[in-house]
């Protein structure tokens, strides 16, 4: 079947009332950005849905795949656009039915947005169904559990006919909900947290704390790859890599061993808070899950949050671990997240970390050293990378260059 359009249905944009135009425009921009590098199509965003006009050479499968990853899209259908005549609809219905397997069943489903169309819904269903039965052998009607469903939408401008409905990612278009800073550790949770806030229309930049030589280049490349996977859905993402070694060593030198985990995370939050103001973000996002580990109890969160007035969003706060793993697999980050490279959260881990840290005590331990200068230095020496969906690490670039030189 050669389709001439893709019908793109909006997600929650239908709920946005007077702001709908802003949301539709942002979604259209996101679609154009996602389809960059492809040709043979024209994007037409309308108030209630989007149409993508296809030329003969358009790669419909690749376009559909990319659209399915964009937040704000509920579903996509390859469609035939036909004239508003029963003859044109009948001819299209026969085209669809010619693709059916022998002895298969079908139904005709009509939605009549144009109430002025001369035939009502049931008349159209009977007429088109009857035409298929007359013209196509060895098929029958089953309205409850059909093998195939020919869908017909009667709209003001034309008739749109289709069979397939490809699920989209739902949510809201990224860029409509402000900017946040995602604390990206390299584990299973934080990429899922990032994806969850992006689903709500939020733009993200990511921050990662790197402590060489205790953390390896492979750990850094792992985080780059996680960012790249996130970028597949939203376009380029800035990744800020913080040199954290000296700060982490100092914490472990001056703070009581049971409190080093709490204090380390307070230092991370202080660095993140400064970066938030530099990049114009409105919140910090992390993958914390209530009670999962010692640093994620309510007492720990209270002690850690105290160093910032910036809102800290925790999309996974009440999820079961299994739910997070399922989502990680769905978005494609799980296999990368479980690669066995240590991040700064797993080094210097005390044997018996405090689970209910006393806020006054952690402040007292940290007061023996002025950390502000070290924090400022860490922020000043941040390495910022812009990660695209086709980003390659230095190691990959070097490997490709060696291959090219050899050839």
Swiss-Prot record:
ATP binds at residues 183-184, 208-209, 265, 287, 296. InterPro entries: Rossmann-like_a/b/a_fold (IPR014729), ThiI_AANH (IPR020536), ThiI_fer (IPR054173), ThiI_N (IPR049961), THUMP_dom (IPR004114), THUMP_ThiI (IPR049962), tRNA_STrfase (IPR003720), tRNA_sulfurtransferase_ThiI (IPR050102). Pathway: Cofactor biosynthesis; thiamine diphosphate biosynthesis. Keywords: ATP-binding, Cytoplasm, Nucleotide-binding, RNA-binding, Thiamine biosynthesis, Transferase, tRNA-binding. It comes from the Bacteria. GO terms for cellular component: cytosol. SUPFAM superfamilies: Adenine nucleotide alpha hydrolases-like, THUMP domain-like. Its main location: cytoplasm. The keyword Zinc does not apply. Its EC number is 2.8.1.4. It is found in: Cytoplasm. Residues 61-165 form the THUMP domain. One of its GO terms (molecular function) is ATP binding. GO terms for biological process: thiamine biosynthetic process; thiamine diphosphate biosynthetic process; thiazole biosynthetic process; tRNA 4-thiouridine biosynthesis. It catalyses: [ThiI sulfur-carrier protein]-S-sulfanyl-L-cysteine + a uridine in tRNA + 2 reduced [2Fe-2S]-[ferredoxin] + ATP + H(+) = [ThiI sulfur-carrier protein]-L-cysteine + a 4-thiouridine in tRNA + 2 oxidized [2Fe-2S]-[ferredoxin] + AMP + diphosphate; [ThiS sulfur-carrier protein]-C-terminal Gly-Gly-AMP + S-sulfanyl-L-cysteinyl-[cysteine desulfurase] + AH2 = [ThiS sulfur-carrier protein]-C-terminal-Gly-aminoethanethioate + L-cysteinyl-[cysteine desulfurase] + A + AMP + 2 H(+). Catalyzes the ATP-dependent transfer of a sulfur to tRNA to produce 4-thiouridine in position 8 of tRNAs, which functions as a near-UV photosensor. Also catalyzes the transfer of sulfur to the sulfur carrier protein ThiS, forming ThiS-thiocarboxylate. This is a step in the synthesis of thiazole, in the thiamine biosynthesis pathway. The sulfur is donated as persulfide by IscS. Belongs to the ThiI family. This is Probable tRNA sulfurtransferase.
């Amino acid at each position: 079947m050669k389709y001439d359009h893709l019908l793109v249905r909006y997600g929650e944009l239908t709920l946005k009332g007077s702001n709908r135009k802003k949301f539709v425009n942002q979604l259209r921009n996101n679609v154009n950005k996602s389809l960059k590098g492809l040709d043979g199509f024209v994007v037409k965003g309308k108030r209630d849905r989007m149409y993508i006009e296809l030329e003969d050479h358009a790669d419909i499968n690749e376009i559909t795949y990319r659209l399915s990853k964009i937040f704000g899209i509920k579903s996509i259908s390859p469609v035939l656009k036909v004239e508003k005549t029963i003859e044109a609809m009948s001819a299209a219905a026969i085209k669809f039915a010619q693709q059916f397997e022998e002895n298969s069943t079908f139904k005709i489903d009509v939605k009549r947005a144009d109430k002025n169309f001369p035939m009502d819904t049931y008349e159209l269903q009977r007429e088109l169904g009857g035409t298929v039965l007359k013209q196509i052998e060895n098929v029958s009607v089953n309205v409850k559990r059909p093998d195939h469903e020919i869908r017909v939408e009667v709209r003001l401008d034309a008739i749109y006919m289709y069979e397939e409905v490809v699920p989209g990612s739902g949510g809201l278009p990224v860029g409509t909900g402000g900017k946040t800073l995602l604390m990206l550790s390299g584990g299973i949770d934080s990429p899922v947290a990032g994806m969850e806030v992006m689903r709500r229309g939020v733009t993200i930049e990511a921050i990662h704390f790197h402590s060489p030589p205790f953390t390896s280049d492979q750990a850094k490349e792992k985080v780059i790859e996680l960012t790249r996977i996130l970028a597949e859905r939203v376009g380029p993402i800035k990744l800020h890599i913080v040199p954290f070694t000296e700060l982490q060593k100092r914490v472990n030198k001056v703070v009581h061993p049971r409190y080093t985990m709490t204090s380390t995370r307070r230092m991370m939050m202080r660095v993140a808070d400064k970066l938030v103001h530099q990049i114009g973000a409105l919140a910090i996002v992390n993958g914390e899950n209530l009670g999962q580990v010692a640093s994620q109890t309510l007492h720990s969160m209270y002690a850690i949050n105290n160093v910032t007035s910036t809102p800290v969003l925790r999309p996974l706060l009440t999820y079961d671990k299994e739910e997070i793993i399922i989502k990680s697999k769905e978005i494609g980050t799980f296999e990368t997240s479980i690669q066995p490279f240590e991040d700064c959260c797993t080094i210097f881990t005390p044997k018996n970390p405090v689970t209910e840290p006393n806020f006054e005590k952690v402040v007292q331990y940290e007061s023996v050293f002025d950390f502000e200068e070290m924090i400022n230095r860490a922020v000043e020496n941040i390495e910022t990378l812009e990660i695209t969906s086709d980003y390659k690490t230095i190691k990959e670039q070097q490997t490709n260059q060696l291959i090219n030189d050899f050839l």
